[in-house]
Amino acid sequence: ERPLMIAGPCSAESEEQLFNTATKLKNNGIEVLRAGIWKPRTRPNCFEGVGVKGLPWLQNIQKELGMKISTEVANAHHVEVALKYGMNMVWIGARSTANPFAVQEIAESLKGVDIPVLVKNPVNPDIELWIGAFERLYLCGITKLGAIHRGFSSYNSTRYRNMPQWQIPIELKRRIKNLPL
């Protein structure tokens, strides 16, 4: 069985950028487009995403190209409007995964919704925090879960922006055997 490929821009910046990217991805066999609509930033006055105005762009791609669409959600409002615009799946970002209150809010807002929810590892290498996010979602009845390993931030300069620390996703897979990673 072919692995599910999800691809797209980190940030949706314009309708044209998103549609051009989606067209190229579809022509290369990608079935799911991902695009960040809201971008949590460390410091103020940085690009924080286009917000809700980008959701119709994704919806248009879904209708015109037949691709599945997904975006990151960080709170109940994001979930509500993402679902309103027909997201086929959502993901919880690394910063949100690190906040149990945010994960709980998202989990509660997804109760009764039957779409996949992917969870990025937290920014810091804490497997219990990552597992806790899955537990919160599962306890709210969300069963279509998957993990995204993006690596972990480091204070020091390193070869990679995010250090893989492979032992953590390997341990996650050992502890939650049927979890897609």
Residue ranges of predicted features:
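Short, well-ordered coil/turn segments that N-cap beta-strands
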Residues: R2-P3, G29-E31, K63-I69, G86-N88, ...
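Active-site mouth loops of central-metabolism enzymes
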Residues: P3-N20, R43-G49, M67-V73, G93-A94, ...
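Conserved, mostly hydrophobic/aromatic
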Residues: G8, L25, L33, A82, ...
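Catalytic cores of alpha/beta
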Residues: E15-N20, A76-Y85, D126-F134
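Glycine-rich, proline-tolerant flexible connector loops at the mouths of alpha/beta enzymes
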Residues: R34-K53
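Charged helix-capping and loop-helix junction motifs
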Residues: E48-P56, R161-I168
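Catalytic beta/alpha-barrel core
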Residues: E48-V50, M67-V79, N88-A102, I115-I127, ...
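Catalytic alpha/beta core domains of metabolic enzymes, predominantly
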Residues: I106-L181
